[in-house]
A protein has these predicted regions:
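Sec-dependent N-terminal signal peptides of Gram-positive bacterial secreted proteins and lipoproteins
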Residues: 2-32
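Long, non-membrane, amphipathic alpha-helices that form coiled-coils
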Residues: 82, 158-161, 165, 169, ...
Length: 385
């Protein structure tokens, strides 16, 4: 995997765009075609596997044959990579593990006690109804109809339950992807904050020098000092936020809360894949893969009440409409992200030229340290945009 620091464009825009285009594990499959560490060390690709694997291999829920030996080794090492998130969630996320265990225990058992109770009540009504009494018979038919609707509404087979569990798991994968992007962005934000602090420190020192020359007041110096102190507070706040994201990633992916996995960079965005995306061509597959559509279509086969059949059909159509709208929204989000990346590239090109010029001028004494820090801060901001 290429190091993000070798990129010739904005880190933040690239990370976001990569996450958007690779988020195929979201509840809607969008395109079918196709502990304290703000400063993360950049290991070689041939990293050494930790002696104490994390996540805990004793927590594996799938059988050994579920993955190849190399795949298991990758999941059990102390390295967190974006491409492993789906499998890490599947194996080690507490919610997914609980759902898988529950599904395994309940599969084949009677999952519909409420449904059975309704059916028993229906049988009792028919058994007690007097067929010779028209009023009693009509009342019984009405009561049975109500109970039948309630029974249908409460019926859920194992396949329907699994669809819901799969949807939950896909949502957790998407959440993990967003957290990993957020964590990477926090590194860039930390560099921006530190660069701004360096500039403020230079401004403070320049103000102090001007005061010594009688060109600035004590109030000016104190104001400049307060700016530095406020920036230190902002850095501490950003660090706490990054630590919280780090802990969330650890907990949802099988590490201990104080785990220290080596978190690799989010992969670079695949611009060729973006160029080949076609929401019209992918619409049918995206709708078919939508979890709500799957659920209501499966439910349709279990309904007997015509009212609920019609209602469920409306829910199917609504889910399809929302899936289609979501696909187009995601596609537009990708295009917006690509445009942001292109803008970041151009801004960084300008900032790079300005920095090279400022560096040369600084070397021969044509600009002050404060002027150089201003240009450097602009470059770092452009690089991390």
């Amino acid at each position: 995997m290429k190091n993000l620091r070798n990129r010739k464009y904005g880190y933040r825009a690239a990370a976001v765009l990569a996450a958007i285009t690779m988020a195929g594990t979201m509840p809607l499959t969008s395109f079918a075609a196709s502990g304290k560490r703000p400063n993360v060390s950049k290991p070689d690709d041939a990293h050494t596997i930790a002696e104490l694997p994390a996540p805990d291999i004793n927590k594996d829920i799938s059988p050994e044959f579920a993955y190849s030996e190399d795949k298991w080794a990758s999941l059990r090492d102390n390295v967190l990579e974006f491409g492993e998130l789906k499998d890490l969630v599947h194996e080690y996320n507490p919610t997914v593990r609980s759902n898988r265990s529950t599904y395994k225990d309940q599969k084949g058992k009677d999952l519909n006690a409420a449904y059975d109770d309704y059916m028993d009540d229906i049988d009792a009504i028919w058994n007690n109804a007097d067929s010779d009494d028209d009023v009693a018979w009509a009342t019984a038919r009405f009561q049975v109809g109500v109970l039948q609707q309630q029974a249908d509404n409460n019926y859920q087979d194992a396949d329907m339950e699994k669809i819901q569990y799969d949807q939950t798991e896909a949502g957790l994968v998407y959440q993990a992807q967003q957290l990993m992007v957020t964590y990477e962005q926090s590194r860039y934000n930390m560099e921006n904050l530190q660069s701004a602090r360096n500039l403020m420190q230079a401004q403070y020192e320049a103000t102090a020098a001007r005061q010594a020359a009688g060109m600035a007041t004590q109030a000016d110096v104190l104001s400049a000092l307060k700016s530095v102190q406020d920036q230190d507070t902002a850095i501490l706040t950003a660090q706490k936020s990054a630590d919280n994201v780090h802990r969330s990633l650890c907990l949802m992916l099988g590490w201990a809360v104080d785990g220290q996995p080596e978190i690799r960079d989010v992969p670079e965005p695949d611009l060729n894949r973006i160029a080949s995306m076609n929401p019209d061509a992918d619409m049918e597959t995206a709708i078919a893969n939508n979890y709500d559509v799957k659920y209501f279509e499966k439910k349709a086969g279990n309904l007997t009440s015509q009212y609920l059949i019609d209602s469920n059909q409306a829910q199917i159509q609504d889910a399809k409409d929302k899936a289609a709208k979501s696909l187009r929204n995601q596609y537009n989000t990708v295009l917006t992200g690509r445009d942001s990346l292109n803008a970041a590239v151009m801004a960084l090109d300008v900032a790079s030229v300005n920095l090279n010029t400022a560096t040369a001028k600084r070397a021969v004494g044509e600009i002050t340290e404060l002027e150089y820090q201003n240009v450097l801060n602009s470059y770092i901001s452009a690089k991390n945009s």
